[in-house]
């Protein structure tokens, strides 16, 4: 069965809408896409790109270039590309939660999301730290943020936290939960029966036997030992500065980093254009672009759709497996 996927552009004033229009120019055989967006915004994006778009009823299938089934999500204010309006924050969140709700009900089999501007959502009066956290709260389940490209997959124990808050957040419970969710996803979603997972230390040189910090000795190593006794293939804790050497990456199926900026700079340097953001642990596949709203590019027709193309292709594969 060909899966039906929600396509949510994110911040309407950013590049998300025009990327969706570009995606609609290439009819797919691997998925049926349904946009959850404001129709006027999509028409404006198509006009800015000098491309055609034909918005269909959500139960219709795209057959021609420019066809895009639409579940309309009306905005409170018109879109001005490059100038976000907090009045539209509720529509952005409604699009995300509506699409995810249809996945939870079984109506859809996955969701592809564009970039969201956190500050604009909060300025609109909605407490929001990220789409990963939003969808986890809706589904009522723990999740893990993983970013991936063709070279490496990186899962995060902590996500959007100030650096000073990270050590306290690295608990045995949090680390074990992240590793279990990551291992299960590698098996279920990526078909790896015995995934090999590298685990980074928190401190420089992975703590150097306690000289540079005790988190490795007190938290990380005991958790790894316990999970190894249960059969998980875990390597580490490894010093982060050498874990990503090309000759080492072939030994791992995924890397678990302790915090956001520990693991993601290397991934983005190695292939930012093709990188995607995967939410592990949800009852449906969710894959997002790995870039921001790029307000300075919006409406100019120069935004690179590579990440959205990669996210859609991966979401279709994951949905077909589930």
UniProtKB/Swiss-Prot annotation:
GO molecular function terms noted in the UniProt entry: 4-hydroxythreonine-4-phosphate dehydrogenase activity; cobalt ion binding; magnesium ion binding; NAD binding; zinc ion binding
InterPro entries (alphabetical): PdxA, PdxA_fam
Keywords associated with the record: Cobalt, Cytoplasm, Magnesium, Metal-binding, NAD, NADP, Oxidoreductase, Pyridoxine biosynthesis, Zinc
Keyword Metal-binding part of the UniProt annotation: yes
Annotated residues for binding of a divalent metal cation: 160, 205, 260
Enzymatic class: oxidoreductase
The enzyme's E.C. designation: 1.1.1.262
Cofactor(s) needed for function: Zn(2+); Mg(2+); Co(2+)
Subcellular location: Cytoplasm
Main subcellular location of this protein, as a coarse class: cytoplasm
Record note on cofactor: Binds 1 divalent metal cation per subunit. Can use ions such as Zn(2+), Mg(2+) or Co(2+).
Reaction catalysed by this enzyme: 4-(phosphooxy)-L-threonine + NAD(+) = 3-amino-2-oxopropyl phosphate + CO2 + NADH
Pathway linked to the protein: Cofactor biosynthesis; pyridoxine 5'-phosphate biosynthesis; pyridoxine 5'-phosphate from D-erythrose 4-phosphate: step 4/5
One of the Pfam families matching this protein, by short name: PdxA
One GO term (biological process): pyridoxal phosphate biosynthetic process
GO cellular component: cytoplasm
Binding, substrate: 132, 268, 277, 286
Quaternary structure, from the entry: Homodimer.
Function: Catalyzes the NAD(P)-dependent oxidation of 4-(phosphooxy)-L-threonine (HTP) into 2-amino-3-oxo-4-(phosphooxy)butyric acid which spontaneously decarboxylates to form 3-amino-2-oxopropyl phosphate (AHAP).
Additional remark text: The active site is located at the dimer interface.
Family: Belongs to the PdxA family.
Name listed for the protein in its UniProt record: 4-hydroxythreonine-4-phosphate dehydrogenase
Native species: Xanthomonas campestris pv. campestris (strain ATCC 33913 / DSM 3586 / NCPPB 528 / LMG 568 / P 25)
């Amino acid at each position: 069965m060909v899966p039906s996927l929600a396509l949510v552009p994110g911040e309407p004033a950013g590049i998300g809408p025009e990327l969706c229009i570009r995606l609609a120019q290439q009819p797919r055989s691997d998925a049926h896409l349904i946009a959850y967006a404001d129709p006027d915004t999509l028409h404006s994006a198509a006009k800015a790109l000098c491309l055609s778009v034909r918005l269909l009823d959500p139960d219709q299938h795209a057959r021609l270039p420019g066809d895009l089934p639409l579940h309309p999500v009306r905005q409170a204010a018109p879109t001005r590309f490059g100038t976000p309006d907090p009045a539209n924050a509720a529509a952005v969140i409604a699009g995300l939660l509506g699409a995810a709700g249809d996945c939870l009900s079984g109506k859809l089999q996955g969701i592809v999301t564009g970039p969201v501007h956190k500050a604009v959502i909060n300025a609109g009066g909605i407490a929001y730290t990220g789409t990963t956290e939003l969808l986890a709260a809706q589904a009522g389940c723990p999740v893990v943020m993983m970013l991936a490209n063709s070279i490496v997959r990186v899962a995060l124990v902590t996500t959007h936290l100030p650096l000073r808050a990270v050590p306290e957040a690295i608990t045995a419970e949090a680390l074990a939960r992240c590793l279990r969710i990551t291992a299960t996803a590698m098996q279920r979603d990526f078909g790896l029966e015995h995934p090999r997972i590298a685990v980074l230390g928190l401190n420089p040189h992975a703590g150097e036997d306690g000289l540079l910090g005790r988190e490795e000795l007190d938290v990380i190593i005991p958790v790894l030992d316990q999970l190894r006794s249960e059969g998980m293939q875990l390597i580490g804790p490894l010093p982060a500065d050498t874990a990503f050497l090309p000759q080492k990456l072939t030994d791992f199926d995924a890397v678990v980093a302790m915090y956001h900026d520990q693991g993601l700079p290397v991934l983005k340097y190695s292939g930012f254009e093709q990188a995607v953001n995967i939410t592990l642990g949800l009852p449906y596949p969710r894959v997002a672009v790995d870039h921001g709203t790029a307000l300075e590019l919006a409406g100019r027709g120069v935004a690179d759709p590579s990440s959205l193309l990669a996210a859609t292709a991966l979401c279709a594969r994951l949905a077909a497996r589930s």
